[in-house]
Amino acid sequence: MTTPDAGGAPGGGLLVRAVRVVAVDRPTPDGEVDLRLRGGVVTEVGVGLAAAGDEQVLDGEGRWAIPGLWDKHVHLTQWALQASRIDTSGTTSAEDVLTLVRARVAADAGAGELSSGGGRTAYPLLQGYGHRTATWLREPTVAELDAVSAGRPVVLVSGDAHHGWLNSRALQLFGLAPREGVVAEDEWFPIFARLGEYAGSPQAVEAAVRSAVAAAHARGIVGIVDVEWGDAPAQWQARYAGGLRSLRVRAGVYADRLDTTLAAGRATGDLLVPGFPLVEMGPLKVISDGSLNTRTAFCHEPYVDAVPGAADDGRGAPNLSSADLAELMRRAREGGLQVAVHAIGDAALDAALDAFAASGAAGSIEHAQLISPSAPARMAALGLTASVQPAHLWDDREAITRCWPDRDERCYAFRSLLSAGVPLALGSDAPVSPLDPWLAIAAAVHRSPDARSAWRPEQSLTLREALAASVDGQGTLRVGSRADLVLVEADPLGGDGLGGGDHTAYLRRMPCA
């Protein structure tokens, strides 16, 4: 449940009876207690509290109470569109994907000229999501996708969202030049941002967003940092006007909207809807390098499987120069914006730290999938947060074995970061991994989703640490805590006697009341 800072529960407040407070970061009272929520905060913790006349009463029935959970890196509209896309996540080759596309085209043949939104269009766009080419034996081609799509435009988004596999009709639709292979990185992101335009009517897309928010609430989510492409602040202002008011949101922008954001005088933390405290301005998001899957993450050393003679020396490449990055961040700082820098390769991370130091900006490193030995101490000294997505390590395990086997001890190094004093914030990067905080927690604690042993277990977090990294710094519920809380049916810190696989399953099915 989420209660605004101004207004609280209808009728003036809420008394939650008979809950067991989970000790996230400090000891808690023994046994069941009552929590009084008023004005957006916890105002009293005790046993047998008397209900005030204007309070609603909720019986917790002995459930466990934790602070509301957050996902610190989401592309919410793209996540909402997943239900209508072909799921290519289980594929291991181009042939596997082509089989799925061929089957979907055949199944949809009866749709004729009907678009997914019910309007009339000659070529309804078919979308898919989830394949990862890093472990494929060859790269996919436009021609082979043409051969199975029967003249229908097709866009297949990679599992890391850093490239799109388009057929010729889709290339024409988006005004791109013919080519043999995929569309990647800077050329790709504007296309990715527009996919919602072809997923049905605006009303249908927003209905999908509402369904995604409801599903997130059911998993205990009370807040997200939404770094959706396009104008996320305007999207959330419109959603507020349309009645979507149950989720805390920090809406970020990208460099293409920095000028208009600064001109509007918006700083990180400013309310996007006057008088409504749940929707705030978020950070400036900067994508400084690429991804592991596309082999565009910027590294100090070449990828082990790099193609000889590659234009980037097999190390990936930065998306902007060090000087341009520092200048962008300086402008953001002067305008009151924090900066969230996407940095996956170790060279990209070190360059981002240089830019933070030069610009004086505050904020976070997003992903930090491969870190240099000096990075944790530098991040701590700069006061930066590591915004990490633990479920990605489950997806990237084979790719790292192929691309970075000589440096895997520095991949997803959560323990190294935390031990150096770097605050961690867990997220999903949905749709790259599902918007499910319990999945992220399970992956951070048990670095294997299956019967295999944990991958680099020395970098695991404890369950308490992972939970603490998922609650937006709120810690154990107490007087003065934000009045966002989740009641769960089982002890989230329990299950210690279970084996790795069983404990992972225990966390992933955590039932929220």
What spans do the regions from the language model cover?
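Divalent metal-binding segments
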Residues: 11-38, 42-266, 293-348, 362, ...
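Phosphate/diphosphate-binding loops
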Residues: 247-282, 363-369, 373, 399-423
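Non-cysteine beta-strand/loop elements that form the S-adenosyl-L-methionine
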Residues: 75, 278-296, 382-393
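Short acidic/histidine-rich active-site segments
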Residues: 292, 337-346, 388-390, 417-440, ...
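Glycine-enriched alpha-helix->loop->beta-strand junction motifs that scaffold or abut catalytic
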Residues: 356-362, 378-387, 420-423, 445
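Conserved, mostly hydrophobic/aromatic
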Residues: 167, 220, 281, 290, ...
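Histidine/acidic-residue-rich catalytic or RNA/ligand-binding cores of hydrolases
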Residues: 168, 233, 237, 349-357, ...
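C-terminal cap of metal-dependent C-N hydrolases
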Residues: 23, 436, 448-513
